Amino acid sequence: MGIKDIDIKENFGKIVQNMDLKFRKIDDKELLIAIAIDKYKNVLMTAFMDKESLKMTLKTGLMHYFSTSRNKIWMKGEESKNVQKVLEVFKDCDGDALLFIVEQTGWACHEGYMSCFHNKVDLNTGNSTVIGDKLD
């Protein structure tokens, strides 16, 4: 059964209950951590999700997140067209984070890098160096 074959409207409550997720209160919002990696296990990005963005992700098969700075749900790629198609979902042992294996179109980082984790930190100085190339 594929992600788009799920009747989200009818089954969302049951799905979330069965997943035994623990949304944490952050800035008066019930959120959990969402980590996106590609099929090669490269970390692409991390963001927050609320229940509605999780529901939209499961319903559409495309990643939706909750922006704490903009206080709204956004679909990855809604402006850049660099969408993330959900392939698999894993939860962590505490149930307060989800790991999504995604098919990334284009780059994941809004700065034009494949990963948001492109700043390597020198543990002796705390200075960071950009690794990798910007993608056009």
UniProtKB/Swiss-Prot annotation:
Optimum pH is 7.5. It is an enzyme of class 3 (hydrolase). Keywords: Amino-acid biosynthesis, Cytoplasm, Histidine biosynthesis, Hydrolase, Magnesium, Metal-binding, Zinc. The keyword Zinc-finger does not apply. Its EC number is 3.5.4.19. Mg(2+) binds at D92, D94, D96. Pathway: Amino-acid biosynthesis; L-histidine biosynthesis; L-histidine from 5-phospho-alpha-D-ribose 1-diphosphate: step 3/9. The keyword Heme does not apply. Its cofactor is Mg(2+); Zn(2+). Reversibly inhibited by EDTA and free zinc ions. Enzyme is inactivated by dialysis against 1,10-phenanthroline, which is a zinc specific chelator. Zn(2+) binds at C93, C109, C116. Its main location: cytoplasm. SUPFAM superfamilies: HisI-like. It is found in: Cytoplasm. GO terms for molecular function: magnesium ion binding; phosphoribosyl-AMP cyclohydrolase activity; zinc ion binding. Binds 1 Mg(2+) ion per subunit. Binds 1 zinc ion per subunit. May play a cocatalytic role and/or a structural role. InterPro entries: PRA-CH (IPR026660), PRib_AMP_CycHydrolase_dom (IPR002496), PRib_AMP_CycHydrolase_sf (IPR038019). GO terms for biological process: L-histidine biosynthetic process. Homodimer. NCBIfam families: PRK00051.1 (NF000768). Belongs to the PRA-CH family. Catalyzes the hydrolysis of the adenine ring of phosphoribosyl-AMP. This is Phosphoribosyl-AMP cyclohydrolase. It comes from Methanococcus vannielii. The lineage of its organism: Archaea, Methanobacteriati, Methanobacteriota, Methanomada group, Methanococci.
